[in-house]
Amino acid sequence: MTFPLEKALDVMVSTFHKYSGKEGDKFKLNRSELKELLMRELPSFLGKRTDEAAFQKLMSNLDSNRDNEVDFQEYCVFLSCVAMMCNEFFEGFPDKQPRKK
């Protein structure tokens, strides 16, 4: 039996490795790999924005060790931040249905 959180972790890891190493280090996302991942896997996050300056700023913010690539740890920090933003967004809505047990 697969549990939802285990499945989520599997998807998180496998998605990273699906895009990493297409052009270089197989354990890191370069600029174009990250952009492809975001466009294909998180299109709602980018929305209609294809602003190159905004993407460059995101890349710069994610690349904490300044090697011009995003490693798995940096990727996880990014996903954690996105998850926290989603949680904060939904905290503003009143509960209309009882919580599942």
Curated annotation (Swiss-Prot):
Q: Ranges for the EF-hand domain?
A: 12-47, 50-85
Name the Gene3D superfamilies on file: EF-hand
Q: Please provide the record's keywords in A-Z order.
A: Acetylation, Calcium, Cytoplasm, Metal-binding, Nucleus, Repeat, Secreted
Which InterPro entries does the record associate with it? Answer: EF-hand-dom_pair (IPR011992), EF_Hand_1_Ca_BS (IPR018247), EF_hand_dom (IPR002048), S-100_dom (IPR034325), S100/CaBP7/8-like_CS (IPR001751), S100_Ca-bd_sub (IPR013787)
Spell out the Pfam families in the cross-references: S_100
Q: Which residues bind Ca(2+) 2?
A: D63, N65, D67, E69, E74
* Database matches in CDD domains: S-100
Q: Which residues carry this modification: N6-acetyllysine?
A: K7, K35
The record's subunit annotation is: Homodimer. Interacts with PPFIBP1 in a calcium-dependent mode. Interacts with PGLYRP1; this complex acts as a chemoattractant that promotes lymphocyte movement. Interacts with MYH9; this interaction increases cell motility. Interacts with Annexin 2/ANXA2. Interacts with TP53; this interaction promotes TP53 degradation. Interacts with CCR5 and CXCR3. Interacts with FCGR3A; this interaction inhibits PKC-dependent phosphorylation of FCGR3A.
Q: What is this protein called?
A: Protein S100-A4
